[in-house]
Structure formats: structure tokens, C-alpha cells
């Protein structure tokens, strides 16, 4: 599936809503591949979570020695979704996991990628965040940083969302950053139509 096709899929998928306006996901199997998608902000509660960017210390798994810090709002949404994906991710017939999200969903996709690479180091895991905001804060442990190296953030032009929360507040981009498209405006560059156009070039 091309990135253009994946972006279209992210925007058109029929999401399972676990909490109105808060947590949603889409999961499908295609052969041995598990595809997990996360949608953009879909209500006032999502927007409130987007601005709950106080960082919290995170040690999400039993026996995990490394502590890292994450955006409080995004991490809270991910923890609602996580229990619904545990069995899907652990399924031994899954040989590849493909993760993607747009905007708010890009941040959740990043946290899902971290979860999947930690729990399924035996398989290929890919992750893309289209117009994804920053999630990690402060120093990131080497083991976590190495796992996250395969996550790709796609930034269209000067998309302002990919610069938030600001570095001034200690947040940092993690993974690989790729810029597509020509800058038009910091807000306009975040529009779905702008990403759709940039990904066709």
C-alpha cells in the first residue's frame, strides 16, 4: 500500500469509538499483516486532550526498566485503546504490523508503534504519522529511541501541528522526519487536502 493509499485509508476507515470524542481505532487483517489506524481529532474532548501537554513519567510495562516522559493527553487516550489491541498484537499468526494515523491520530500511532515494537520484536513493525504532533518530552532512553527509529513523521510544508507542543516546553520529535510538499501556510499545510495533494506529487 502506497503512502497516498494509506493516508486515504486513515481518513476513510470506519473507526471503533471506545469513548465518544476521545478514543478510537481501526484494525484489520490482510493476510499475515495487521493494520492499525488512528483518526484525527473528532470532537471537543479530543481537542482538550491535545492541549493537555503536561508531560508525565511513563513506565508502561511490567519489568520495563526505562522511564520516559510523554504528552499527558495523548498517553491517556492511548491507554484507553491499548487493552483492545493486546490480543491482536500478540497473535502469533501476525507477521507484520502496519500502523498509521493523521494529526491527533498520528500521535496515538506513535505510542502504538512503541507498544508494538516492545511486545513484538520478532516481527516487522512499520509506523507513519501524517502531520503528527510531538509526544515525547525530555531525554529519551536509548532503548526506546532505538525502537522508535523506524517510525516516520510526514510533515507537509510548514505544518504547524508537527511543531507542537513547542521545543521550548521540552517536547521533541522522535523517529524519522520527512517533509513533503511546498509550504503554503502553517495552518493550511495541515489540512487533509494539502496532505492528499503533497502525497500525490
Which positions does each model-derived feature cover?
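Non-catalytic, mobile gating and regulatory segments of ester bond hydrolases
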Residues: 1-100, 104-201
Amino acid at each position: 500500500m502506497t503512502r497516498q493509499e494509506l493516508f486515504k485509508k486513515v481518513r476513510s476507515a470506519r473507526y471503533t469509538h471506545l469513548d465518544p470524542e476521545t478514543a478510537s481505532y481501526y484494525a484489520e487483517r490482510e493476510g499475515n499483516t495487521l493494520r492499525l489506524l488512528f483518526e484525527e481529532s473528532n470532537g471537543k474532548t479530543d481537542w482538550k486532550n491535545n492541549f493537555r501537554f503536561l508531560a508525565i513519567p511513563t513506565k508502561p510495562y511490567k519489568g520495563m526498566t526505562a522511564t520516559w516522559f510523554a504528552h499527558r493527553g495523548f498517553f491517556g487516550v492511548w491507554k484507553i485503546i491499548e487493552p483492545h489491541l493486546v490480543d491482536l498484537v500478540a497473535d502469533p499468526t501476525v507477521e507484520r504490523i502496519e500502523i498509521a494515523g493523521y494529526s491527533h491520530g498520528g500521535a496515538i500511532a506513535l505510542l502504538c508503534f512503541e507498544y508494538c515494537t516492545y511486545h513484538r520484536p520478532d516481527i516487522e513493525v512499520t509506523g507513519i504519522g501524517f502531520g503528527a504532533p510531538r509526544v515525547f518530552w525530555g531525554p529519551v532512553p536509548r532503548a526506546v529511541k532505538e525502537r522508535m527509529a523506524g517510525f516516520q513523521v510526514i510533515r507537509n510544508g510548514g505544518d504547524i501541528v508537527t511543531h507542537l507542543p513547542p521545543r521550548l516546553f521540552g517536547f521533541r520529535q522522535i523517529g524519522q522526519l520527512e517533509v513533503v510538499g511546498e509550504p503554503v501556510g502553517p495552518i493550511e499545510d495541515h489540512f487533509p487536502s494539502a496532505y492528499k495533494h503533497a502525497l500525490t506529487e
